């Protein structure tokens, strides 16, 4: 009598927000290449469907498209409920959805500031609130929060954005201790200026950004690769690029008043 055929082990599942472009899209390739099935979350259905088809064809993985506007307070809860009903609890949660506005604070509308807070802070917090308990109940999981090099110092003309990313970094560091010995790790990816659609939009608003030397602009695929590797290794903080790491270390040892002064000079020089 033939032995019963063993069922192949299910592939790990990675949920990526902000998956339709930039670092988020690049990260979907990293996880798919490593054999993860994907849940793709962003607002654009067309972009997500095109990405899902590409991932399936290139890596032979499953890719579930779940369009959502995470700026809506209920969106994270709806995602969690839907995946729970499907018995699809992510092994990896990647919080990459975000928005950037580069202008002096008073030149922006209150709605612009609120949009950054809603997506960069509130949506990320809601995703963690709904998905971390599932991972803890299972006893395993990984989280990758996309912050920014701007999280380490004040950045005039990026005041709200930098503050929102400082929140992400601080929250990640705090949770890394709360989650110790739980089987769940959490990582903050803190990229510098990266060649993405977000940078293109910022450059349209401020043409001086387009004059930055190429060596200061990170490659999106390399940033994603380093973030992926840090997440899988359980590192708490990942700062891609030698220059960015040097800037991060300098910011942690430089007096706050001097950081503010230098930031102000740079903001005026690029305004």
Pin down the residues of each PLM region.
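Substrate-binding pocket helix/loop in short-chain dehydrogenase/reductase
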Residues: 104-106, 112-117
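Conserved glycine-rich cofactor-binding loop
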Residues: 20-22
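Conserved NAD(P)H cofactor-binding loop of Rossmann-fold oxidoreductase domains
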Residues: 96-101
């Amino acid at each position: 009598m033939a032995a019963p055929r063993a069922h192949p082990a299910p592939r790990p599942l990675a949920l990526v927000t902000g998956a339709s472009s930039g670092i988020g899209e690049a990260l979907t390739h990293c996880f798919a290449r490593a054999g993860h099935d994907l849940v793709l979350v962003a607002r654009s259905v067309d972009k997500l469907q095109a990405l899902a088809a590409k991932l399936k064809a290139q890596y032979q993985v499953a890719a579930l498209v779940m369009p959502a506007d995470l700026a809506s307070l209920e969106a994270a809860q709806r995602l969690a409920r839907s995946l729970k009903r499907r018995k699809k609890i992510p092994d990896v949660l990647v919080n990459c959805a975000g928005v950037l506005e580069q202008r002096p604070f008073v030149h922006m509308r209150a709605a612009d500031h609120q949009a950054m807070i809603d997506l960069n802070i509130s949506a990320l917090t809601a995703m963690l609130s709904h998905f971390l308990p599932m991972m803890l109940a299972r006893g395993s999981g990984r989280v990758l929060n996309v912050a920014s090099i701007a999280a380490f110092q004040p950045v005039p003309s990026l005041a709200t954005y930098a503050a929102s990313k400082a929140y992400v970094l601080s929250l990640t560091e705090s949770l890394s201790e709360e989650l110790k010995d739980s089987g769940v790790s959490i990582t903050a990816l803190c990229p510098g200026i990266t060649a993405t659609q977000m940078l293109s939009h910022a450059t349209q608003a401020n043409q001086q950004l387009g004059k930055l030397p190429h060596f200061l602009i990170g490659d999106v695929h390399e940033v994603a690769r380093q973030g992926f590797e840090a997440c899988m290794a359980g590192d708490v903080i990942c700062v891609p690029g030698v220059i960015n790491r040097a800037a991060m270390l300098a910011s942690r040892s430089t007096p706050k008043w001097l950081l503010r002064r230098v930031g102000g000079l740079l903001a005026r020089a690029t305004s």
